Amino acid sequence: MVRKYETVVIVQPDLGDDELKGLNAKVTDIIATMKGDLHRLEDWGVRKLAYPINKSARGRYYYVRFDGDAALIAELERRLRLDDKVLRYQSVKIEKETAAPAAKVAPVETAPAAEAAE
């Protein structure tokens, strides 16, 4: 059964471009070989961590949004667990697609100039 997932991966902040491209290729290859559908792979950049992980105070965040089955998520997490460059990862099954609520604009009441002067 195909389900929707999103995964956030935190890697070491000092990786070079070749290593980052290799990590991106690894994730896309796993999803492709397990017959998944990759929707989004975003680099969120280097951010400060809430607490040090492996003596590192910063980490590079990646967001991956894909469709797949349970075998795909198990294989992806297994490969991420074995990679020394990955500090942490978290995969979540998306139950419902939620759209951002439209911002409500309250009408601004302006007092007439005559009333404001009194």
Swiss-Prot record:
Cite the Pfam families for this sequence.
Ribosomal_S6 (PF01250)
The annotated regions of Low complexity compositional bias extend over 99-118
Q: What is this protein called?
A: Small ribosomal subunit protein bS6
Annotated coiled-coil segments of the chain: none
Q: Which UniProt keywords apply?
A: Ribonucleoprotein, Ribosomal protein, RNA-binding, rRNA-binding
- Annotated Gene Ontology cellular component terms: cytosolic small ribosomal subunit
User: What job does the chain carry out?
Assistant: Binds together with bS18 to 16S ribosomal RNA.
Question: Which gene produces this protein?
Answer: rpsF
An example Gene Ontology molecular-function term: structural constituent of ribosome
Please tell me the species this chain comes from.
Geobacter metallireducens (strain ATCC 53774 / DSM 7210 / GS-15)
HAMAP family in the cross-refs: Ribosomal_bS6
Domain of life, source organism = Bacteria
Q: Which family does it belong to?
A: Belongs to the bacterial ribosomal protein bS6 family.
Gene Ontology BP, a term: translation
**Renumbered residue ranges of the record's region Disordered:** 98-118
